Amino acid sequence: MSENTSTNQQNNTQLEGGTYEIIRKRLQKHGDELIVRLNNLNDARKNVFGAVETTLIASDRISTENNCLAADILALDNLCIFGYNVYMGLKSEVHLSDVFSLYEFSGNNFHEKSLEIIEDEHFLDDFRNMYRYYRHTAFVRFTILNAHLYMIFKIGKNHSDIKVFKWMMQADNTLQYIDDRSASEVRLPEQYEFEWQRTKRDMHRNGKHPHVSIQDRLFVETVGGDLTIKIEDNTQSGKGIYAEDVQYKEQSLDDGEYFFADLGNLIALKIRPYREPARYFIYNAKLQTVKRSDTLEDSAVLLPDGHGLIFSDGYFLQTGEFKRFDKQIRGMRFEKRIVSPNGEDYLFVFYHQATSEYILMSYNIIDQKVSTPILCNGYTCFPNGELCYFRAEKEPTKHHVIQIWQTPYTKNEPITNVDKDNFLFKIGNKDIVRAMAECHEILKLLQKQDSYSNLYGDLVKETTDVLDSYYWIDKSDTFLLNEPLLEIKKAATTAIDEFEKVKRIRQNTKEQVANISKKAEGLFTKTKRTRFDDIDKYVQFLAN
């Protein structure tokens, strides 16, 4: 290559690379402006519709007559039923007060009341008979399904050996007893909100390093001594983006079992090597990264609006954010989701049948984050959004600490004195929240490096979707969100072409470096086999 050619290419590299950097800075500038306007809109939204932040209000103690192990807690309007288990010893008969206490919750304190609300004669007969005929009876928990309250008791050695008392929850917050034959109605929802697809024989690719093709996007195998996940359909190479050892080194491709679920940018994988338990992984196509997460064996739930996947110890977003929390408890099953009235916050509840533990995970669709999970043995939510929960003591006690948090999980939206002609009021809180969430997704994309697959194409698509979906986006009352969005779209469109130029430059530079390195390596090899009488001959040899 001539000196002039080299100089020209270097100048082009600097020019085109500089243009690309200018576009990146422009995107960042418009992103900063979008943040300012979103914050202004959020403040205005809260003034109109009100806002409830998650904060610790107080801690109180529920006091019981006997030493006991707390089991669960349930709110009925402003009343609260507390369930527990007392060591009976030589006591011949179990009374209702040996298992339940009733409290009125006011002023962040619990005030004991009579058990009149559940002193139904038919229920009392069934209750006494249960303790008479089943020696190892223990109260487990409350659950509410379709306006019915279920009191669940364990009556045998297995966790599936249960007796369930069913109550109808009346509109006036009273309870009407139904029966003790409803155990079959108490079951958890589907633990996967997607279907695992098993790979078929026609997905196998034979070769020196055979693998199974997952929709021609991902390639997996358990041969050659390790489990490998690849992103190239290349059976001549055994290298991939992720690998870990398997127990049986000599297994064939047919010996393993492979399952997958297509979740957009994410692909969930369930791979069972020969004579081993299944291993679980999540692949992100945008970042081309793999994370192992064996808690997927227990359950996995979709986040709202296609944001990604949540499980009992973490979550994985479509945009690549992955978070695993320290509290990892195997065997947690998905029980329910609770949605705030404005659609901004989602509470995901996971339950462990053997240990009677709950994990509560609150996800905010605007911030697209899960706050620190709550691990507890019992929880309940009052209509005003006050969440009460407790951790059971290891030893029986008369005093049980209850933490009380204010949360956005109210029964109804906060009531504010607002002008019904207010433009934001006419739009509606949920619509604004959804638009803000989509704008925050754009902001997350702006933080990505250009190694993120199709980054600028995604920015163009996302900004176009927001601009086309919300008629109010260009109004002054919503702070003209369309302006920074249009600028981001314009800059991203330009960046697509410029980034292709930069990629070509980088690839060309990479090839030149590889070529020069190869020549240098050959030259150094020759010098080892050649004798030089003086330094001038050595320098001349290198120059040629």
Feature-to-residue mapping (PLM):
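Helix N-terminus capping/helix-initiation residues
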Residues: 340-341, 364, 428, 534
